[in-house]
Amino acid sequence: MRSLTLAAVLACSLLLVFHTSAAEELEVQDGHLMNPGDGDTALATVDDERIIECFFSCEIEKDGKSKEGKPCKPKGDKNKDKKCSGGWRCKIKMCLKI
């Protein structure tokens, strides 16, 4: 009976040692993961480039330089038939690619 108790205690302590070492390893790996609050500069740059691209495309359509584009109409404009074309939508007086 004593040997069975001793074996159970040793097994539990061995399991505890493995569990704590695995938990420490996960803590070390957790430092390498990106947290949700961290900003990613590459994604921010892409978003800025898209906004600039949308703005320039809208300006081209407004100026009539695009053969198939129509002028971007702001909300409340009297010319409701004029819209952005080619997948662009008018938002905040700018054509945005959707």
From Swiss-Prot:
Disulfide bridge positions per record: C54-C84, C58-C90, C72-C95
InterPro entries registered for this protein in UniProt: Hwtx-2-like
Region span, Disordered: 63-84
Keyword Cytoplasm tagged: no
Reported tissue expression: Expressed by the venom gland.
Signal peptide residue numbers: 1-23
Subcellular location, record wording: Secreted
A single cellular component GO annotation: extracellular region
Pfam families per record: Toxin_20
Main location group: secreted
GO molecular function, one term: toxin activity
Function as written in the Swiss-Prot or TrEMBL entry: Is toxic to both insects and mammals. Induces reversible paralysis when injected into S.frugiperda larvae. Reduces both the amplitude and frequency of responses from muscle (GF-TTM and GF-DLM) pathways in the D.melanogaster giant fiber circuit, suggesting an action at the neuromuscular junction, which is mediated by glutamatergic receptors. In mice, intracranial injection of 30 ug causes increased urination, myoclonus, hypermotility with circular movements followed by respiratory and generalized seizures resulting in death within 25-35 minutes of injection.
Family recorded in the similarity comment: Belongs to the neurotoxin 12 (Hwtx-2) family. 01 (Ap1a) subfamily.
Miscellaneous: Negative results: has no effect on human Nav1.2/SCN2A, Nav1.4/SCN4A, Nav1.5/SCN5A or Nav1.6/SCN8A voltage-gated potassium channels (at 1 uM). Does not alter the response induced by acetylcholine in a rhabdomyosarcoma cell preparation (at 1 uM).
Protein name: U1-theraphotoxin-Ap1a
